[in-house]
């Protein structure tokens, strides 16, 4: 983002020569952050030596699948900067995000995680397009919203990536917390896949219910990402998670989106402290659940089973839990910058 104090320093996509790219050494440090096993380190190093391999399904897709899986399990989806940071300002600068995610072992919300990942993928040789989405109100933390407005969507408030492999585009999203797809999905109308068992995901191209169009043929069609929690039922019930477009979004688009979601008092992110990491099985082949901190409680969800892991009584306990459970370390300045009204007793 441009400097806040200078009204003439407007955000834009830099010229090609000025765009941030991570070095081979920085990408190898990112692989270390992901805790890649040797087989994926070898694959990643092969792509580093020959970036053209990144655009093939034979090499690029397995590496992309591994990066997506290991990123969501080792880089948290979190909004701690909005509560503990002394300035409460979210950076979307790729160089600063590298420091935050790789050097400090922190995470971020959708735009932080996906801007960082998009930069890493381009640095590896992938063709990547930044896109935007609207989160479904069926995902709202408020029961009354889910009950009364589940067929509607928020405004543009989400980011995801499209990655071109072989001859088709794949959706990639490491910034949706526990409700993310957790795998690269082909941009195919009607695509369905197992995500976190038993949950299934679906991709459809359809119009959404909110439209001024006078008929279905006039309504704009969006790509819609849905989930089914109980696919064993005789008739599957699909719940919308978000809709998105193939239109390329620019840094100035995300600046507007991030500013709203990080400053609006009605925003989930400004009201509640949250942190999520996904959990892999013992063989590190599939994601089986998640650990999520919401306000003062950490819950573990494995498949359909959910339990409370820890409930914090004091702020000191919550900060200790961030370290022990999520491997998130706050500085003393950050610990002291949480407003008094948000501190646990």
From Swiss-Prot:
Keywords per UniProt: Acyltransferase, Transferase
Record flagged with keyword Transferase: yes
UniProt-listed InterPro entries: Arylamine_N-AcTrfase (IPR001447), Arylamine_NAT_domain_sf (IPR053710), Papain-like_cys_pep_sf (IPR038765)
EC number: 2.3.1.-
One Pfam family of this chain: Acetyltransf_2
Pathway(s) the chain acts in: Xenobiotic degradation
Enzyme class name: transferase
Induction: Expression is induced in response to 2-benzoxasolinone (BOA) exposure.
UniProt GO MF annotations: arylamine N-acetyltransferase activity
Miscellaneous comment in the UniProt entry for this protein: Fusarium verticillioides possesses 2 unlinked loci, FDB1 and FDB2, necessary for detoxification of antimicrobial compounds produced by maize, including 2-benzoxazolinone (BOA). The FDB2 cluster arose as a duplication of the FDB1 cluster with rearrangement and expansion by incorporating additional genes.
Function: N-malonyltransferase; part of the Fusarium detoxification of benzoxazolinone cluster 2 (FDB2) involved in the degradation of benzoxazolinones produced by the host plant. Maize, wheat, and rye produce the 2 benzoxazinone phytoanticipins 2,4-dihy-droxy-7-methoxy-1,4-benzoxazin-3-one (DIMBOA) and 2,4-dihydroxy-1,4-benzoxazin-3-one (DIBOA) that, due to their inherent instability once released, spontaneously degrade to the more stable corresponding benzoxazolinones, 6-methoxy-2-benzoxazolinone (MBOA) and 2-benzoxazolinone (BOA), respectively.
Protein name: N-malonyltransferase FDB2
Source lineage: Eukaryota, Fungi, Dikarya, Ascomycota, Pezizomycotina
């Amino acid at each position: 983002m441009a400097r806040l104090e200078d009204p003439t320093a407007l955000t834009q996509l830099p010229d090609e020569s000025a765009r941030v790219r991570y070095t081979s050494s920085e990408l190898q440090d990112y692989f270390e952050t992901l805790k890649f096993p040797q087989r994926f380190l070898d694959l990643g190093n092969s792509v580093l030596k020959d970036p053209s391999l990144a655009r093939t399904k034979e090499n690029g897709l397995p590496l992309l699948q591994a990066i997506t899986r290991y990123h969501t399990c080792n880089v948290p989806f979190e909004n701690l900067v909005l509560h503990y940071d002394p300035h409460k300002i979210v950076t979307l600068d790729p160089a600063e995000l590298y420091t935050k995610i790789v050097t400090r072992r922190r995470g971020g919300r959708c735009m932080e995680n996906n801007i960082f990942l998009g930069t890493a993928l381009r640095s590896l040789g992938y063709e990547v397009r930044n896109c935007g989405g609207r989160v479904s109100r069926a995902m709202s933390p408020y029961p009354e919203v889910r009950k009364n407005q589940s067929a509607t969507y928020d405004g543009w408030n989400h980011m995801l990536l499209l990655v071109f492999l072989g001859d088709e585009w794949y959706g990639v999203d490491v910034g949706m917390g526990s409700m993310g797809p957790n795998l690269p999905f082909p941009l195919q109308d009607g695509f369905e896949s197992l995500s976190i068992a038993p949950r299934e995901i679906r991709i459809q191209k359809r119009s959404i219910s909110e439209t001024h169009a006078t008929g279905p043929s006039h309504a704009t069609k969006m790509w819609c990402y849905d989930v089914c929690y109980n696919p064993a039922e005789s008739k599957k019930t699909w719940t919308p998670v978000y809709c998105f477009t193939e239109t390329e979004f620019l840094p100035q688009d995300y600046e507007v989106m991030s500013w709203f979601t990080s400053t609006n008092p009605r925003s989930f992110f400004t009201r509640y402290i949250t942190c999520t990491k996904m959990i892999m099985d013992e063989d590190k082949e599939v994601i089986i659940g998640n650990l999520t901190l919401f306000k003062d409680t950490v819950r573990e969800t494995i498949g359909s089973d959910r339990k409370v892991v820890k409930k914090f009584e004091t702020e000191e306990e919550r900060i200790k839990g961030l370290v022990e459970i999520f491997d998130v370390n706050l500085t003393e300045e950050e610990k002291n910058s949480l407003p008094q009204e948000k501190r646990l007793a």
